[in-house]
Design a protein with these regions (language model features):
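A "functional boundary" signal
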Residues: 5, 11, 17-233
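N-terminal secretory signal peptides that target proteins for export/translocation
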Residues: 1-2
């Protein structure tokens, strides 16, 4: 709740910014939208409103800015749990970032295209682009986007679960946990850890599944996540 006034203040100031013109203003607007959606998943809807307000100005954006706009718009939609229905825009965005992007931008672009295929029920294509996304991650770099990397492995875990591939699911979730901790995202690290129980349950290892649930519940409670603790056990 403490975050909400900050978000609203940012939105008000950015609506004013969106009325300005020039490359710097466009860059600032995109950066602010990205910062807002990174606060938490709920704030992504505020970022979408901001980006929607900027949409009439897209013809004034440079190509690089338009590509970043589309990349961030898809990122915000994904965080807000808005389903994708077409891959046409993200295919163009991926093609652009393959030639012009940083490792983090390429990772995000491939990830978003994978999420598009997830939503249109093309699981093999989703996994292909999730894998491509993880290959872009430069884990030797200090600015590696571990927050995105852990989410990619988390999504891979979900797809492997749906395809009844428990060992692949466990492998993906182990990496999701690892990179969530690197991103200092304790809550999602614990959620990924708890999600491993379904794979052990599928394998008939009921005791292992119960141990994971119990440990996850204790860790959730230790870190103050009582809601998740009650769900876990």
């Amino acid at each position: 709740m403490k975050k909400l006034p900050l978000v609203l203040l940012a939105i008000v100031s950015l609506f004013v910014l969106a009325g300005c013109h020039g490359d710097k203003q466009h860059d600032d607007l995109l950066q602010q939208a990205d910062s807002i959606m990174n606060i938490d998943d709920d704030s992504a809807k505020f970022a979408i409103k901001l980006l929607d307000k900027a949409k009439p100005q897209l013809n004034d954006f440079s190509k690089a800015q338009r590509m970043r706009y589309q990349l961030l718009y898809h990122k915000a939609m994904n965080k807000a749990d808005i389903l994708f229905s077409s891959d046409s825009i993200m295919k163009n965005v991926v093609a652009y970032y393959e030639k012009h992007g940083t490792s983090n931008e390429r990772m995000l672009a491939y990830y978003m295209l994978g999420c598009v295929y997830r939503d249109i029920h093309e699981a093999p294509m989703a996994l292909e682009y999730y894998n491509k996304a993880t290959e872009q991650a430069d884990t030797t770099s200090q600015d590696c986007d571990y927050a995105t990397l852990c989410r990619i492995y988390g999504q891979m875990g979900i797809l492997f679960e749906k395809q009844f591939l428990p060992y692949q699911e466990l492998g993906a979730l182990d990496k999701a946990v690892k990179y969530a901790y690197f991103a200092k995202d304790t809550l999602n690290a614990l959620r990924y850890y708890q999600n491993k129980n379904s794979a052990y349950d599928f394998l008939g290892k009921k005791d292992s599944a119960m141990i994971i649930n119990l440990k996850a519940a204790n860790l959730f409670r230790k870190h103050g996540y009582d809601y998740d603790a009650n769900i876990a056990f």
